Amino acid sequence: WFICGVHGNEISGVDSGLMTAYHLLAAQNDEVAAAALKNSIVLIDPMQNPDGRDRFINYFRQNVGRFPDGDLQSAEHNEAWPGGRTNHYLFDMNRDWFVQSQPETRGRTKFYLEWFPQVVADQHEMGTNSSFYFAPPALPWNPNLTKTQLDWLTRLGRNNAAWFDRFKFDYFTREGYDSFYPGYGEGWPLFHGSIGMTYEQAGGPAGGLGILTNTGDTLSLFDRAYHHFTSGISTIEAASQHAGELIKEFHSYFNNAVNGNVGEY
């Protein structure tokens, strides 16, 4: 399950979600797409926060010139309050998954409980001068999560690394982003047995259509969306190749919860 755009001003995940859907449906002679359609069900939620995205897109259109300006000081890269991160009620929904205070969050958890996806990828953006983050996560590791889940995070991360190495994309793991808090878009699914992951692409609210980084390179919206698309195809590949194993271990997670040992507290 790909969930995109919970922060409405982190726009590349939305575009990559559409790219992924199109690729799976239209690709010709692609072994990854064929295996995915045969062995798995791919769910894509391309827009978790329509109100925040609407605020961001309207601000950008009102402040961009005839041609995009990559200079970070340009108005198009400096979003005004309240910005597009939050929903209509100015709530950060990537903190809300276990509180369930927002209608958008309740809609996602209802959908999750209808499908129980084995793998969940929550697509985000971060600062313009970073690269790309994927699992395994940073410490601390929540003790209520299982070793099997951590092993899967590592396996999926290694497949991402292989794809990124192939295209010479920069990335990092095990730093900055942990899986401790159950209110994240990756955290709540983890506590329900899924392999939940955050994917972070450089860009963020300042990214616009293109931004000059501190190395002098231009990071375009296409670049950002393509990096997310690449991690998505990698995730689909790994999950579809090991679909039977994922389902078996997902079943074991709930069986152990009911019949396994009781926790110390």
PLM regions: where:
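The substrate-binding groove and active-site-proximal loops of carbohydrate-active enzymes
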Residues: V6-E10, Y89-Q102, T109, W141-L153, ...
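Sec-exported extracytoplasmic/periplasmic mature domains
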Residues: A21-D30, F98, L113-F116, D165, ...
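Hard-cation-handling environments
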Residues: R166-Y265
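Short hydrophobic beta-strand segments
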Residues: W1-G5, V262-Y265
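Extracytoplasmic/secreted proteins, especially bacterial periplasmic and envelope-associated proteins
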Residues: S12-M19, H23, L43, H88, ...
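Surface-exposed loop and adjacent secondary-structure segments within mature catalytic domains
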Residues: S16-T20, A34-S101, T109-K110, H124-P143, ...
